[in-house]
Amino acid sequence: RLVWDRHTGTLTGRPGAQRLAVTSGGTIPDRGLFGVFLASDTGKQPRRVGELDEEMVYESRVGDVFVLGASSWRIEDITPDRVLVTPAPGQPGKLPFWHGDTPGRPAELGRAIGAAVRKLSAAGEREAAAKLEQAGLDELAARNLIRYLAEQRAATGYVPDDRTLVVERFRDELGDWRVVLHSPYGDRVHAPWALAIAARLRERYGGMDVQALHTDDGIIIRVPDSDEPPPTGIALLDPDDVGDLITQEVGASALFASRFRECASRALLLPRRNPGQRTPLWQQRQRSAQLLEVASQYPAFPIVLETVREVLRDVFDVPALTALLRDIASRKVRVVEVETQTPSPFGKSLLF
């Protein structure tokens, strides 16, 4: 909305820029939910089943089955503002999710938590209890925490900390392989790491539906329909290539599409048609998708670059992940692998 004269070094507003800034300005993004309605209803007002987060709708396709409430539903159609479904009783489906603005644990805090766990694990029971009581825990809480760490060490032989990451492999109740990476470094590091690991596994297994979940305390990978255990070294990625791999994977994700819409809105590329009146979210999504389709042909388009920066540095913490992978490559942080019959105590807390 500005003209930059590189010869004179001046910026001037284009015609209508002032009105556009007044009517469409603001930095708080519009976010919303897709309504879920029964597709079989023929009345004027179809019955409403519930709501889904827009990112989940972006990741869903016609024919997918999901669970809402106590029932399973099959997607029959996805329109710009709603999802039409039919009942799918007895069929397993994926669980819906709703994203909030809760930032994950910073890598610096995760490193400090890992260091504290390492010192507690190395100390004797009395010394550890004294340290925990000095930190404000009562006797019962300190005893429970010490027992929790001891049970994890008994199950896997290791307790994950800032210098030791544990990769645990086991079969779930369906016979599928589960891989749990225990790490204290936080969700902003684990989210892009999980994305990269899943991409590598899909390449290895020929496009198999590898599911990767992430939390502040680790990563859970599910590898279905495989008799062989997942390969060793699953978490060992090249720190020089991981940034490009994550950028490639993020570019086609629902997260990138939603963040692009927010960046384009802040840049006044999705102006409101009527001052003082919000544009319906489905119209914003539609216009944003059209803009992204054109902008994706120009990798240096400023809004594309800003969206990439926001995803890789604000939502994720790719620099911290790269630094961690370099520490692993230089043996400053070790990765140990164990195979268990059932999930360890730490693994159970991640799975359930």
Descriptions of predicted regions:
Residues 1-33, 96, 104-352:
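Extended, highly charged accessory segments
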Residues 48-60:
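Short alpha-helix capping/helix-loop boundary micro-motifs
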Residues 31-51:
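Short, basic/aromatic beta-hairpin or loop at an interaction surface
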Residues 71-78:
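Short beta-strand-centered aromatic/proline hotspots
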Residues 1, 68-69:
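Short amphipathic alpha-helical interaction segments
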Residues 79-96:
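Short, solvent-exposed secondary-structure boundary/capping segments
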